[in-house]
Every structure is written in structure tokens, then in C-alpha cells.
UniProtKB/Swiss-Prot annotation:
It comes from the Eukaryota. Keywords: Cytoplasm, NAD, NADP, Oxidoreductase. Changing residue 178 to A/F: Abolishes enzymatic activity. Pfam families: PRISE. It comes from Catharanthus roseus. PANTHER family: 3-OXO-DELTA(4,5)-STEROID 5-BETA-REDUCTASE (PTHR32487), NAD-DEPENDENT EPIMERASE_DEHYDRATASE DOMAIN-CONTAINING PROTEIN (PTHR32487:SF32). InterPro entries: NAD(P)-bd_dom_sf, PRISE-like_Rossmann-fold. This is (S)-8-oxocitronellyl enol synthase.
Length: 388
């Protein structure tokens, strides 16, 4: 089955209407519940699960998110359910009737990184689905490589593991809601005879204007504002981050990785890293970003005072409103479509490389070219009219 995982970038971009023939709906082999479907990986799952050659398919897909269904997601073949999963009664009311679910893909979190709230959200999902979906087989939990260096709120108080990160490294002795989610997963799947998988993606390159940590969207907005104001694209990060190697993962590849673990017996009950299988440097990404927007690039300058991207963009709300109106873009607010604080963290980080050896040894051979993935995400932002 490993041939399927070698697909090209953007494979889910143009979905055929593969689930209908002569107006009659096909039967489904598997039914997915994607929690966090408007997020960066959730939206990719919504596309990749519906491809005609996706293993385990044909798939029916329920998509859950807190906000109303956005226009760009409404065009996807997903049964959308607006639900605040932090509310137990609302979650039970809306999800317990879904008795045909076979696989849960949990790719959601709350931005405060609060352990109790994130744990409650996950528990509410499992408590609503497991007792009612008699055909449930697998629960996929997505966390991330913060498992190896701590959550953002702990900052410099944490001594991270040495990279490259491998899945067998012990938990750091600091609060991390990933630990709470894993413990809940192990307990609930164990007592209900379900299989599970935990996925730890690297920095994700993908499309979703609703994501709290979308580096590509953030950089696209920054570059768009620079072009609008006829300013150079200045790198706001550290010297080390400018020069060191980094890794990332295409959101579609994360989706493929999670589907693989959900259907391939070799990958069941495993903790798995996920990245593109190559490395890049921000200095090269920065050059490509400037080229894509047709603006001058200014990289790291030795001795120059470093100004954070959040500081550079703090008064640009009205500028962004002008850009949206001038170019007839999908209406968005700056705080919705860009996370400058997150870019600042990425541009001050170094040596956060994870190993894909375990997944390869188990049979997952998927990969992406990180530079091409980055450009593809820019193209998608333009296709959906979020940037000019």
C-alpha cells in the first residue's frame, strides 16, 4: 500500500465528485470524524479522505469546529457540524447521534495551551462517540514536536531534548497538555478495545485562514503589507535561525500519515513523528517569499537591532483592511489570518529537527519538497482570494 503515500503536492486541490454515480450515493466503507476541521491539518484531512484512491475508502467525513462553516470549506464534501467541544452537553447533543463513525481524527486544541481545558475537550469527544458508535475502530490524536521542547508558555524555563527528536524520548518534567491528551487516549482506547495513534508533526506548511499557528499565512500577510507599503521584506529573526537547518511538514502529508496509521495494521498503537523528509534554511525560504511577492529582501543583518514581527505589524489592522478592500479579497481581519507571535517563535528557534525513521521502518514512505510545499501554500492562498 506504500505506493499511495508518494503522491504529489496539492493532490487534494481538485476533488472529483467521486461518491455519486448517476445521482445515486455509493456506500461508505469508513466514516471519519475530523475534530478541528477548519484548522491547518483538519482542512487537509477533509480533502485527502475524499480522494478516490484513499485507503480505507470510500470515506464519509463529518467535520467538527467551533465556528460557523467558512465559505472555503463549504465547497468540500464534508458534513459540517458546528460544535463547541469544550461544552459537554452540546458535544453529547450533536455527536452522540453519529452512530456510524469508524475513525476519530482529533486535530484540535485551544490556544491558551491550558491542560485542563484541552483535556476536557478531548474527553467530551470520546465520551460522546465511544458509547454510541459501535463500529468505532481507531482514534488518531495529533499533538506535535513541542513534546520534545515544551509548550510556548514555559519558554526558556525548559531544557529541551537534543535533536534529532525520536519518539522514544521521555516526557519532559514540565506541564504540557500533550501529556494529558495522551493519557486520556491510552486509557479510553485500552478499556474499549480500540486502536490508536499519536502524531507529532513538525512546523506545518498548509492552508487555513482559521489556524492559530499558520506560518505560511502569516508570512503571506507580512509580505503583502510590505508590498502595499513599498517596503523591503525584513527578516525579524535571529542569526542562528537564519543560518541553521529546520524542518517542516506539508499539511496534506500529515493527513496522509494519519490515515495510514488509521488503516495499516503495522502503524496501529504507535507514537509517530511526521515531517517532509528534508531540511531547509529560513534564508532560502525568505528569498523565495520575496520572489513570490516581487519585493526586495533584507535578510539577517549582523549588529542590527532585532525587531519582532509582532512589533512591526502591531498597528497594521487598518492597512490590512485597505488591502482586502482594494483587491476584493475574502474579508478577514489581521488578527484572524496572521499569527505574528508564532512567526517570532519560529524565527528564534533552532535545531528542532525530528526523525522519520520509525515511520519509514513501519512502511510510510511519503515525503514532500519543503520549498515546493511552501510555494504551493502561497498559490492556494491566492486561489482562495485571501491574498492578492
Amino acid at each position: 500500500m506504500s505506493w499511495w503515500w508518494k503522491r504529489s503536492i496539492g493532490a487534494g486541490k481538485n476533488l472529483p465528485n467521486q461518491n455519486k454515480e448517476n445521482g445515486v450515493c455509493k456506500s461508505y466503507k469508513s466514516v471519519a470524524l475530523v475534530v478541528g476541521v477548519t484548522g491547518i491539518v483538519g482542512s487537509s484531512l477533509a480533502e485527502v479522505l475524499k480522494l478516490p484512491d484513499t485507503p480505507g475508502g470510500p470515506w464519509k467525513v463529518y467535520g467538527v469546529a467551533r465556528r460557523p462553516c467558512p465559505v472555503w470549506l463549504a465547497k468540500k464534501p464534508v458534513e459540517y457540524i458546528q460544535c463547541d467541544v469544550s461544552d459537554n452537553q452540546e458535544t453529547i447533543s450533536k455527536l452522540s447521534p453519529l452512530k456510524d463513525i469508524t475513525h476519530i481524527f482529533y486535530v484540535s486544541w485551544i490556544g491558551s495551551e491550558d491542560c485542563q481545558t484541552n483535556a476536557t475537550m478531548f474527553k467530551n469527544i470520546l465520551n460522546s462517540v465511544i458509547p454510541n458508535a459501535s463500529n468505532l475502530q481507531h482514534v488518531c490524536l495529533q499533538t506535535g514536536i513541542k513534546h520534545y521542547f515544551g509548550i510556548f508558555e514555559e519558554g526558556s524555563k525548559v531544557v529541551p531534548h537534543d535533536s534529532p527528536f525520536t519518539e522514544d524520548l521521555p516526557r519532559l518534567n514540565v506541564p504540557n497538555f500533550y501529556h494529558d491528551l495522551e493519557d486520556i487516549l491510552y486509557e479510553e482506547t485500552g478499556k474499549n478495545n480500540l486502536t490508536w495513534s499519536v502524531h507529532r508533526p513538525a512546523l506545518v506548511f498548509g492552508f487555513s485562514p482559521c489556524s492559530m499557528m499558520n506560518i505560511v499565512s502569516t508570512l503571506c500577510v507580512y509580505a503583502t503589507i510590505c508590498k502595499h507599503e513599498n517596503k523591503a521584506l525584513v527578516y525579524p529573526g535571529s542569526k542562528n535561525s537564519w543560518n541553521c537547518y529546520a524542518d517542516a511538514v506539508d499539511a496534506d502529508l500529515v493527513a496522509e500519515h494519519e490515515i495510514w496509521a488509521a488503516v495499516d495494521p503495522k502503524a496501529k498503537n504507535q507514537v509517530l513523528n511526521c515531517n517532509n523528509g528534508d531540511v531547509f534554511k529560513w534564508k532560502h525560504i525568505w528569498k523565495k517569499l520575496a520572489e513570490e511577492f516581487g519585493i526586495e529582501m533584507v535578510g539577517y543583518v549582523e549588529g542590527k537591532e532585532q525587531v519582532s514581527l509582532a512589533e512591526l505589524m502591531k498597528d497594521k489592522d487598518q492597512v490590512w483592511d485597505e488591502i482586502v478592500k482594494k483587491n476584493n479579497l475574502v474579508p478577514t481581519k489581521l488578527k484572524e489570518i496572521a499569527a505574528f507571535w508564532f512567526a517570532d517563535i519560529a524565527f528564534c528557534s533552532e535545531n528542532l529537527i525530528s526523525s522519520m525513521n520509525k515511520s519509514k521502518e513501519l512502511g510510510f514512505l511519503g515525503f514532500r519538497n519543503s520549498m515546493k510545499s511552501f510555494v504551493s501554500c502561497i498559490d492556494k492562498m491566492r486561489d482562495y482570494r485571501f491574498i492578492p
